[in-house]
Amino acid sequence: MAIQADGSAGEFERVVHMPRHIPDGIAFDEDGRLWIACHRPDAIYVYDLHTRRWDLFAEDWKGEALRGPTDVAFAGPNRDILLAAALDNLVVHRFDGVGVRGLRLNHPKI
């Protein structure tokens, strides 16, 4: 959704359609890709906004390890560590060496 010059919301656009998935938390990387934690089917996907293609980053088809990832975030001094919170087993998973850096967060002065 584009933000207009006056601050109002522009036209709504569906970015990705994920039938039979329950997407939850998201994070952007510096390449403009969207990282998506899917509570079901226990997976993390990476969606490229330019090519409109989504690729599987991590999956747990048995539901024994990721166990319902709900959020993803980039961490570390270089923002090159991916963290994924899991609702079903109350842990945060750490993925080192994902090959990208997370988008720097915007901290506006209010």
Language-model regions, residue ranges each:
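Short loop/turn segments that connect beta-strands within beta-propeller blades
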Residues: 2-7, 48-52, 96-98
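Residue position within the beta-strands of beta-propeller blades
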Residues: 36-37, 84
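Beta-rich, blade/repeat-based domains predominating
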Residues: 15-34, 63-81
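Structural motif
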Residues: 1, 43-46, 90-95
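Blade-level signature of beta-propeller repeat domains, shared across WD40, Kelch, NHL, RCC1
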Residues: 69-110
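A short beta-strand motif characteristic of beta-propeller blades
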Residues: 10-17, 53-62
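Surface-exposed loop/turn positions within WD40 beta-propeller blades
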Residues: 31, 40-41, 51, 79, ...
